[in-house]
Each structure stands twice: as C-alpha cells, then as structure tokens.
Amino acid sequence: MKLSEIYNFLDQLSPFNIQESWDNSGILLGDRDSEISTVYLSLDIDENIIKEASENSLIITHHPLIFKGLKDLYDKTYPRAFIKEMIYKNISLISMHTNYDLSHLNTYFTEEILGFKISFKDKFLIYVENSMSFEALCDWVKKKLNLQILRVSDCGKKDIKRIAICTGSGGDLISKVDADCFLSGDFKYHQALEALSNQISLIDLGHFESERYFSQCLAKDLKNLPLQVIITVSKNPFQYF
C-alpha cells in the first residue's frame, strides 16, 4: 500500500482533524507515494525500534516524535538523531495521539483492560458507575494492570460510586471531573491538592502503564490490510525500586 492509502485508512478510523490544537498527529516523515509493506506499531520511538525496523517501512506511534519546531538536524540530540536515522533508512512515521485517545484508546483501556462498563463520555473523560470502596478499586486496578504499587491520593470517601478515567496525563482535567475518583497518570503535586479540595480521590496509573495498549488496540483494525503488522515492545523509561 502507498503511505497515502494507509494514512487515508487511519484518517477514516480516527480522524486527524479531531486532535487537540497543540498536538502534532499525522504524517511526520515520509513520501505519500512510498510503497509500504511492513508496519511497526509502538507507543514511542526509541533507538532499538529504529534499529530493528526494515528499510522502506512505516512506524505508527501514539506519541509524536516531533512536537516543537526544529531549526536543524545538525547534532545527535533527541529527537534529531532518531529523525536522521529514519531518513537514512527511508522509514516513514505516522503518529496518532489525541485523536486516537478520543476515538479509541480511552474506551479500549476502560472496557478491555480495566473491564468496566462505560456509563458516559465527556471528550477525554470516560465515566463509570460502579460502587466499591477505594481500597477495592485500588486492588482491582493493580490486578488488571499487573502493578505492584500505585501512587494514590485518598479524599476519605468510603464508597466510590462514580469513576472518571483518562489515559496518559489527565491532571489538567481535574477541574472538569465530576466523580468520586479519577484514574489517570502524571498527576502533579498541586493537582492532587486541587482534587482533594474537590473531594476527588486520585489513582495515578502512570503514563506508560495506561497507554502501553495503543499497539494492540490499533493492530486489530489493521489485520485485514495487505500489510505485515508488527507490534514492538515499548519500554517504560522509568523503573521502580
């Protein structure tokens, strides 16, 4: 398939025009007329993925490698080194970020990974009506995500009746959350204080931990295309001791 044909398919699946104004989803590298036979799916780009990717292939990531304007590709700093190596190997790059959060990933994570039934949606926020204690909810999340520990903020409510969920970094949405507990990642100190003042408990899922399912979610929609689709092993840049 041509890169343009793959892009058009992805645009039908998850329209790029619904991405946030600050986002940079879409074709970031490549020639629209390039013929593609192999596609790699990954949460992010790293040197191992570029090394293992075949020439003339396509990488589809969740997070855009290019966010801010680059004045040059002179040195070996991030992301310049990756971009130069991909150009050398004629590797194309498409990113599906906030558009895919809205259309697929938040829903997939809530239903298929956490095993909840969605009550309603409000853009990036998924709401679940499911009464349980805060401790029971924490245990449920750890089991479903295979986590040993969670960073939490408990407002003291004994019964959690409504849960809000957002993959990735959802801390900026706290003022809009109408729930007893908010599940997301990358919560900041003052965001936790704001949540406590609003009687909202927080469960920090971790950014990587909540979005690592991007590749398996997208792969199911690409299986009928005449492409070899390879799910790469995305790695969390953080470790816990």
From Swiss-Prot:
SUPFAM superfamilies: NIF3 (NGG1p interacting factor 3)-like (SSF102705). Pfam families: DUF34_NIF3. The keyword rRNA-binding does not apply. InterPro entries: DUF34/NIF3 (IPR002678), DUF34/NIF3_sf (IPR036069). A divalent metal cation 2 binds at residues 63, 207, 211. A divalent metal cation 1 binds at residues 62, 101, 211. GO terms for molecular function: metal ion binding. Keywords: Metal-binding. GO terms for cellular component: cytoplasm. It comes from the Bacteria. Gene3D superfamilies: NIF3 (NGG1p interacting factor 3)-like. Belongs to the GTP cyclohydrolase I type 2/NIF3 family. Homohexamer. PANTHER family: GTP CYCLOHYDROLASE 1 TYPE 2 HOMOLOG, NGG1 INTERACTING FACTOR 3. This is GTP cyclohydrolase 1 type 2 homolog. It comes from Campylobacter jejuni subsp. jejuni serotype O:2 (strain ATCC 700819 / NCTC 11168).
